[in-house]
Amino acid sequence: MLMLCAFIWGTAFVAQSAGSGMGAYSFLAGRSWLAVLVLIPTVFAFDAVRKKQGQPYGWPKEKPERKTLLAAGLVCGTFLFAASAAQQIGITINPSTAKAAFLTAMYVVLVPVFGLFLGRKGSAQLWVSMVIAVAGLYMLCMKNGFGGIETSDWILLSCAVLFSFQIMSIDHFSPLVDGVRLSLIQFIVVAVESSAAALIFETPTLAEYGANFLPVVYCGVMSSGAGYTLQILGQKELNPAIASLIMCLESVFSALGGWLLLGQNLSMRESAGCALIFAAVVLSQLPFAELRRCKKSA
């Protein structure tokens, strides 16, 4: 599920770069309202399936449960708004999707680091996987090095910090609430906050949305509506550090999408970067701890 999420996000980088000609908040507002429109029927569809299977469905009836769901949507939505806005602003200033993909994916390191402050101790296996993933990300995305740290780079690094908070918020709330409803409320929050920011700081026009119709639709329906819902559902029973590792595959899928769909050739360095990231994800999933326990009990 998170692998599919990474694929959708990876291909969305091209769409975001194509939409960098319009205001960052306007772009985010458009894609978020589209996500809301997609998620409303999705909630009803999930309810219908659950009803058929005899499982609990519908909105929470108890006040504490409703409060938890609303709090979850507000917290996750606010972090997602801030992270997505920072990402789009960074891409608008410097449309280098490669650098944006690398700097954004630094959440792969930040999530386990922040987890230490919450008492989550990562295994040596996990930390080795992180180092391999960062090396792979650098080889894949940074063909000519950093070329000096620019303003857009600091904005994209702040985006990685904010995405780390969003991932950890999802980790906290997803076992407590319905995932699809959390996704819906999260995007209502993002849509309202980004619309307010667009009206204050920008001048959105219908002509602007018409000129960027396809990027907004793809990011709204696929990246926001589908991708972030898959993230919530996929993270439900997974260590957030491992989840962040799997999701950093978005950089690999971004490069592979360009190769397959746009005819952009992958160099040996980029191919090696893809292989390292994939190896890091596989390494993080290998059950070394279980094998050691089995050997001890044998």
Language-model regions: role of each:
Residues 39, 122-142, 194, 248, ...:
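Hydrophobic transmembrane alpha-helices of multi-pass small-molecule transport proteins
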Residues 19, 27, 31, 90, ...:
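Hydrophobic/aromatic residues within transmembrane alpha-helices
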Residues 38-43, 107-128, 252-272:
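C-terminal transmembrane-helix exit sites in multi-pass transporters
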Residues 1-30, 39, 78, 82, ...:
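Glycine-/small-residue-enriched transmembrane alpha-helix faces in small-molecule transporters
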Residues 12, 47-52, 57-103, 139, ...:
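Specific transmembrane alpha-helical segments of multi-pass solute transporters/efflux pumps
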Residues 1, 26-46, 71, 75, ...:
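Hydrophobic alpha-helical transmembrane segments of multi-pass integral membrane proteins
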Residues 10, 14, 40, 77, ...:
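Hydrophobic/small/kink-forming positions within alpha-helical transmembrane segments
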Residues 6, 30, 100-106, 170-191, ...:
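Helix-helix packing/entry segments at the starts of transmembrane helices
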